[in-house]
Amino acid sequence: MAQPLLSLRQRFESTFSSHRQEIFMFLSRIQSLGNGILKPHQLFSEFQAISKIDRLKLEDSALVQLLNSAQEAIVCSPWIALAIRLRPGVWEYVRLNVHQLVVEELTVPDYLYLKEELVNASSNGNFVLELDFAPFTASIPRPTLTKSIGNGVEFLNRHLSAKMFQDKDSMHPLLDFLRLHHHNGRTLMLNNRVQTVNGLQDILRIAGEYLSKLPSDTPYSDFEHKFQEIGFERGWGDTAEHVSEMFHMLLDLLEAPDACTLETFLGKIPMIFNVVILSPHGYFAQENVLGYPDTGGQVVYILDQVPAMEREMTKRIKEQGLDIIPRILIVTRLLPDAVGTTCNLRLEKVFGAEHSHILRVPFRTEKGILRKWISRFEVWPYMETFTEDVAKEIALELKAKPDLIIGNYSEGNLVASLLANKLGVTQCTIAHALEKTKYPDSDIYWEKFDKKYHFSSQFTADLIAMNHTDFIITSTFQEIAGSKDTVGQYESHTAFTMPGLYRVVHGIDVFDPKFNIVSPGADTSVYYPYTEKKRRLTALHPEIEDLLFSSVENKEHICVLKDRYKPILFTMARLDNVKNLTGIVEWYAKNPKLRELVNLVVVGGDRRKESKDLEEQAQMKKMYGLIDTYKLNGQFRWISAQKNRVRNGELYRCIADTKGAFVQPAFYEAFGLTVIEAMTCGLPTFATIHGGPAEIIVHGTSGFHIDPYHGEKAAELIVNFFERCKTEPSHWETISAGGLKRIQEKYTWQIYSERLLTLGGVYGFWKHVSKLDRIEIRRYLEMFCALKYRNLAESVPLAVD
């Protein structure tokens, strides 16, 4: 007979009874550190510091197993409280009394209260605002298996299709959905001649028999009038064959529904014609902006995403038998002081697309339009007015409501939430990066960060957006729920506190079926393998040669490579703390063997002008210090940010020509677009294990994982690769080919676009026919936004032109 599972408290108590002395000594050691918050590596270090005999006795105990799952410890004598992550998304909280060796289970508010006591005990006597979104999602089905995280639409379709389609009466929401379907006043799918499910089945069979006698390529216009008389309108397909496929799918659903058929059917229904994409911050333009402050991977992502989406929308609309022109608007900020960019133009056509445009709307206050760039951390006072202005501008451009609104990053997702709520439109959220995970303890010590980063506004906006949206897409599983040992970006918002501000008891559930993993790719017109000689941009080679090897030092490049025949270790990113470009320079500088084997080329920061970004200024100062301290000139080249994407693509390929490698050393990377770009060009890649690259790369097969917190080991791994390539040249080719194979299987914009548009349709359908519109939570969020977010945003100083 199976034994019942022991609770967390019982597991601790069983260890206390068998190892009382050893546990007392260990916990006393932790307590002696004084009151405070300890991270997992500190707990591990303290355990390693106890006597070897005690360590051996405890190694297999439940205490150590649970300590290995602890993400944090709060020492508040005589108690030690632990936040234990049993698996991704599943947490429990306990506290241990060091003197009495007793254990108590804690609720989330109890645990957060103890944490607040350490930081701001004086505020705990007052009423504390608690945020708890759990009651609003209680009726929404959720999976329980870790493998289901990020596969929300599959779970939702399985669960709700089984529930909805139990009998013919429960089919009415689907019938109503098809009958109410329209675009710009034009009825699609079914007209009012179809009143019942039985009636729908009858005409599907009649029409199916008629279609079976026609040539498969017969255009819909040939039988449009006949079908209209029995209840069908346009939208089923452009030819007899496509219409017949749709009819058969719907008949199958009405007879014996299954999740796969339902998703395929919904993906083919014409639902998305107009899309609005929000990305307010930075310098959003198509040329000469990459490397500007707050302007990097997100801009590239959207400019690659939009042409691919437009192509997929155009293809679907044609196959649906419609003559509607799809429109995509990328809404960003208009910058009157455009600094040599097109950011002062209201409307700009997107390269590679026919009907997609960048629509720019300025930030304004009562005093007028803000002219200059401001940091993404300072945008909060402008967002609500910006939203109102955006609503007017998109109405002017589209002459209709959008069918899907996609937000990007914190402020883009907040604006998307406000717009979607105002217009009643399906909303998609893409975080790219949630700052709370990039800056450790930025929640508990928010007041220390707030003057510089205004995280109180940003974290509040993030909570509003992730709970308001209909669906969230992420590039990786790690973005949602981390890994066995690390907490995911969204998962870190499950429970946290900002003392004196509010306490989040239940912020988000990573098992929520709104989460879906949809990985992007690289623009294959720009990024393609170095081996495709006929496509190579040889006309650019002289200037790339000059960029890498010229003996001239100026504001575009400093330091000279003396041995131009060595392989190049290459990295390219924004110059900020998290991207850690100075980290890779330091690893290289301190490893004589690596310096002997390869040259290091870093592209990042803009030395051609004075940076207004404080982080970039600090990183530049550090870079100059490393160059001087380690005498890197001769083996190292520092190039200012390169804004020409086409040339950057050829630059990757030229690095591959040297049999070099790409390294991405970030402390955390939500996805890793440069990793995709480098691998698409055939460049062997070393990338951080913290975040998305851990999923993109299969270690040792399509690249290598490195830990930026252990730079010496990372440098040794790179040394080992290049040493092996010297003795076994085919090893370089093997890793290069492995990277290309990985990209082609999983990371292309075509796969991405197909998935995103299907998700938009499926969630739009479920929102219409079930309670997934989450009305209750949206009313709660309106109040939270008005009473808390607005005050926080108003406390952020307005910029001065």
From Swiss-Prot:
Any one GO molecular-function label of the UniProt entry: sucrose synthase activity
Catalytic reaction(s) noted: an NDP-alpha-D-glucose + D-fructose = a ribonucleoside 5'-diphosphate + sucrose + H(+)
Record keywords, A-Z: Glycosyltransferase, Transferase
Pfam families membership: Glycos_transf_1, GT-B_Sucrose_synth, SUS_EPBD, SUS_N
Keyword Transferase set for record: yes
Residue ranges of the region described as GT-B glycosyltransferase: 271-748
Keyword Glycosyltransferase attached: yes
EC number(s) on file: 2.4.1.13
Tissue: Exclusively expressed in flowers.
InterPro entries registered for this protein in UniProt: Glyco_trans_1, Sucrose_synth_GT-B1, Sucrose_synthase_pln/cyn, SUS_EPBD, SUS_N
Enzyme class, UniProt record, top EC level: transferase
GO biological process, one term: sucrose metabolic process
Subunit architecture: Homotetramer.
Job of this protein: Sucrose-cleaving enzyme that provides UDP-glucose and fructose for various metabolic pathways.
Family (UniProt): Belongs to the glycosyltransferase 1 family. Plant sucrose synthase subfamily.
Protein name: Sucrose synthase isoform 2
Species of origin: Daucus carota
